[in-house]
Amino acid sequence: MSEPGRKPPLVGKSSHDNQQEVLRLERVRKSYNVGLPTEVEVLHGLDLRLQRSDFAALVGASGSGKSTLLNLIGLLDTPTSGEILLLGEATTAMDDVRRTAVRGHSIGFVFQFHHLIQAFTALENVLMPLIVAGGKPTPEQRAMGEGLLQDVGLKGFADRRPDQLSGGQQQRVAVARALVTRPALLLADEPTGNLDSKTADDVFALFRKFNREFGCAVLLVTHDPRLSSQCDRTVTLTDGRITADTANPRLDGKTLPPSGLRP
């Protein structure tokens, strides 16, 4: 039961509306060493919108601000000015407890390095966000975790530890872990950087599956033009500014404007 006066976590609808806005950035700026002679602004007034149906690539040269932006969106850091809204709720005024709850329930993270806990089984790693949030998982949650392992192609691997899995299999566990809370937004930072092309394609297909079936918006940082071209839209970050937000042609030959550019 929630604490009196405490808002519930932001969670996606079980029957999702693909047009629901998941993320909105309004004139977001980020500076370091504020007020000092060494102050430097790394993000310059960014505006961006993502809907549940969006599957977007975030591209840009090293040092363009991609990781900084992902940290802000993922509530791992706060902007110097501007506002970030998740499912319509402003995040800059959230206290630490609220930010932690939202981050744990509404945002999924997948990184280049999977960061699995070596002493835990694959299933225990998948259930870790639920363990952190509420203690011992229920039988229903364990069944959901096993279902996710099956979804990512690891049926029968629940009791294996990371050192008994290949690199690609470990990354699949990380994907299942990111999705166990049914987040409204999935942030993926170079998730296929250490994988061979076949495994990278498999991981990408998993992201696409959850985007379409569960209305989980995806923002994927990648340096691989082959992968970014398969996303619905590509957001280009140059020297801390969004310089392009373009729709990619769909397989059916139609092109939709990215939601960030829709009225």
Model features per residue range: what roles?
Residues 1-31, 244-263:
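ABC-family P-loop ATPase nucleotide-binding domain
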Residues 21-230, 234-237:
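ABC family nucleotide-binding domain
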Residues 106, 143, 171, 242, ...:
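A generic membrane alpha-helix/interface feature
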Residues 234-247:
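H-loop (His-switch) and adjacent beta-strand-loop-beta switch element
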